Regions:
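The conserved 3'-phosphoadenosine-5'-phosphosulfate
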Residues: 35-36, 168-274, 293-300
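PAPS-dependent sulfotransferase catalytic domain
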Residues: 60-75, 129-211
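PAPS-dependent sulfotransferase catalytic core
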Residues: 1-85, 100-110, 114-147, 174
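A short acidic, amphipathic alpha-helical/loop segment
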Residues: 94-97
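Active-site rim elements
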Residues: 52-56, 85, 152-161, 182-185, ...
Length: 300
């Protein structure tokens, strides 16, 4: 349908989608809105009332078709249109809506070890000061009460990466060849090759080489929690800066300062890993044959 995407990055969260969005936008064959994660197909015509920390991420999603089309209004004629909303893989409603509006759309999903993905999501939430619990194991134990209270899907750490269940919904509506599935390990091992595969899949020039020098959306823990709070939460200084500095520039500065304040900490608590393997192990075992990959390493 004219004015709607030719391709979608549907997931997964914390699996390099921010970087892919940046790399694909550099291609002269492609137009992607600067607004990553509009989430339209997850929430079309929904009255959004998400609660809990960081609820604005969901509540500010694009829900009207006219607003969604407007995201692509600046594209040149004949160019490929696309967007990246990792929530589409998670959303039960997204596959049906995508099939209705853009049945021929090409899709890409990068899947990360769900145990690592869940912990990375937790670190992301602590980085942006929206996770009120410092211990990951305790956060996992609070999942059900948080979901029942209407908190945003991010806080369903072990619910978010149920890839086999999620792909079932897509394969019920689309030919498998329409969805390119790769893993986060593929991205880390050969980002140039992965980009070429994605470009070829969506119909762009696969020989295009993007600038991949900037590290994006890295996780970790804050070295100085008070400084991280200052950066991420509204206060008189940040509000004053917001009055004179454009939002895009302000967010770039904030994220760079936040990255400087982060330290790599990949030590997942053993109790948390045990909980995740119990919850997600059957999903991993089913996913491997589904996508034709040996994922036994994800169970270790």
């Amino acid at each position: 349908m004219a004015g709607l995407p030719d391709f979608l990055i549907i997931g997964a969260a914390r699996a390099g989608t921010t970087a892919l969005h940046s790399y694909l936008r550099q291609s002269p064959d492609i137009f992607m809105p600067a607004h990553k994660e509009p989430n339209f197909f997850a929430f079309e015509d929904d009255a959004l009332d998400c609660r809990g920390p960081g609820a604005e991420f969901i509540n500010n999603s694009v829900t009207r078709m006219s607003d969604y089309r407007a995201l692509f209004a600046g594209a040149k004629t004949g160019i490929l249109l696309g967007e990246a909303s990792p929530l589409y893989l998670y959303s039960p409603k997204a596959p049906e809506r995508i099939a209705h509006h853009v049945p021929g759309v090409r899709m890409v999903a990068i899947l990360r070890n769900p145990v690592d993905q869940a912990f990375s999501h937790f670190l992301y939430a602590t980085k942006y000061r929206i996770e009120p619990v410092a211990d990951f194991t305790e956060a996992l134990r609070r999942e059900e009460e948080r979901m029942a209270a209407g908190w945003q899907p991010l806080f369903g750490y072990s619910r978010f990466p149920r890839y086999a269940e999620q792909l079932d919904r897509y394969y019920a509506r689309f030919p498998r060849g329409q969805i390119l599935i790769r893993t986060y390990e593929d991205y880390l091992a050969d980002p140039v090759g992965l980009m070429a595969d994605i470009l070829g899949h969506i119909g762009a020039d696969r020989s295009f080489r993007a600038d991949m020098s900037e590290k994006m959306n890295a996780g970790g823990r804050a070295k100085n929690a008070a400084f991280q709070d200052f950066l991420m939460k509204s206060n008189p200084v940040t509000r004053a800066i917001g009055m004179v500095v454009p939002k895009a520039a302000r967010l770039r500065i904030r994220d760079r300062l936040a990255a400087m304040n982060m330290t790599r900490d990949d030590r997942m608590p053993k109790a948390a890993k045990a909980i995740l393997l119990e919850r997600l192990g059957p999903e991993i075992e089913r996913l491997g044959p589904m996508i034709g990959r040996d994922l036994s390493g994800w169970l270790e």
